């Protein structure tokens, strides 16, 4: 009869890093196989946004652990509603002012947000030519 071994692990798992690895992997795959790379690029862009939001949660929890315990509730209402509110709150907690949203590289965040919203709340697109 085999001996049963039980292992326990303690620590932290950095989800934003795992999500970023997907971005890197999809980007590399797109470079290696340019034909059909649209889908690799699309996955990379979506995961880039998810990695950013996960990183905001990581930083926010470090800066304001009590607030982040009930993060979903806090960011469900004004003045810090949704992703927009979350990024503004993290910047505020870090003592930083928000950069202009129409200037790179910060404008890329909002481009990715639009893409995420478009795909997450996708509707049938009617094309009439």
Question: Which residues does each predicted region cover?
Answer:
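Short, hydrophobic, well-ordered secondary-structure elements
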Residues: 38-61
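Flexible secondary-structure boundary motifs
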Residues: 57-129
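Amphipathic alpha-helices that form helix-helix packing interfaces
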Residues: 23-26, 48-55, 112-119
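Short linear sequence motifs
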Residues: 7-9, 13, 48, 73-76
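Charged alpha-helical initiation segments
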Residues: 1-42
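Generic detector of ordered secondary-structure context
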Residues: 15, 43-44, 108-111
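Short, structured coil/loop segments at alpha-helix boundaries
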Residues: 33, 50, 99-103
């Amino acid at each position: 009869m085999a001996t049963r071994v039980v292992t326990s692990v303690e620590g932290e798992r950095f989800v934003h890093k795992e999500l970023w690895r997907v971005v890197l992997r999809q980007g590399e795959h797109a470079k290696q196989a340019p034909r059909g790379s649209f889908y690799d690029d699309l996955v990379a862009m979506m995961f880039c946004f998810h990695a950013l939001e996960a990183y905001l949660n990581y930083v926010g929890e470090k800066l304001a652990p009590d607030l982040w315990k009930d993060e979903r509730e806090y960011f469900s209402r004004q003045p810090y509603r949704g992703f927009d509110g979350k990024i503004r709150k993290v910047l505020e907690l870090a003592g930083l002012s928000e950069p202009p949203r129409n200037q790179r590289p910060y404008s890329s965040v909002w481009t990715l947000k639009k893409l995420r919203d478009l795909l997450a709340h996708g509707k049938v697109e009617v094309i009439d030519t």
